[in-house]
A protein has these predicted regions:
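N-terminal targeting signals for export/organelle localization
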Residues: 1-49
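Generic structural signal for well-ordered beta-strand positions
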Residues: 56-57, 154
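Short active-site neighborhood of thiol/selenol oxidoreductases, capturing the structured segment around
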Residues: 57-80, 99
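Thiol/disulfide oxidoreductase modules built on the thioredoxin-like
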Residues: 117-121, 127-174
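Structural microenvironment flanking redox-active thiols in thiol-disulfide oxidoreductases
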Residues: 80-119, 128-134
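Short, small/polar residue-rich loop motifs at catalytic or cofactor-binding pockets
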Residues: 42, 65, 139-141
């Protein structure tokens, strides 16, 4: 192999390592204030109103299957892109996973309805409160938590997540 070709390969490899290092650092920084998932911490309870004014209760100690709680803001452009990934996963999960989408940082119910009008969603859409935001330590949008069947926080993330990345976190795809 020519010396010049080796240099290009090493340079490309170094650039990939730098990119991965930056990506990992940013991901860690985004998640640092979220609830920990490396312990046996139970997810917080909540009772929130849905879009038809029914109260939905979530009690992690009563869970019998995995749950994804997705937090979004109606003004968030990344949320507009990623919520369709969540819906696609819900459609293909055959009811084996509970899904909740929780609107936060909204000014009016109409603002949330306008957001929802752009998406064909079948999961429950709940109107979150500042208490919900604080209980789940949401610092940006979109954010989500995967909660196992025992109510324990299993995974978390903030920002855009690909459909395949979410499927891996939910245990629907094995690597």
């Amino acid at each position: 192999m020519k010396k010049e070709t080796k240099k290009k390969i090493v340079s490309g490899f170094n650039q990939i390592l730098i990119f991965l290092g930056i990506f990992i650092a940013i991901t860690w920084w985004q998640q640092k204030d979220m609830l920990p998932t490396s312990s046996s911490l139970r997810a917080p309870n909540f009772s929130l109103v849905d879009m038809t004014d029914n109260v939905v209760h979530f009690n992690p100690s009563e869970q019998t299957q995995k749950t994804l709680v997705y937090f979004f803001a109606p003004w968030c452009s990344v949320c507009h892109i990623s919520i369709d990934n969540i819906e696609s996963i819900k459609q293909s999960s055959d009811g084996k996973i509970n899904f909740y989408a929780v609107a936060l940082d909204w000014k009016s119910k109409q603002e949330v309805e306008t957001f929802l009008a752009e998406h064909d969603l079948t999961m429950p859409i709940l109107l979150g409160t500042n208490e919900t935001l604080n209980d789940f330590k949401i610092g940006g949008f979109p954010s989500y938590y995967v909660i196992d069947s025992n109510g324990i926080l299993q995974s978390k993330d903030m920002g855009y997540t690909t459909e395949i990345g979410m499927r891996v976190r939910l245990g629907l795809v094995e690597l």
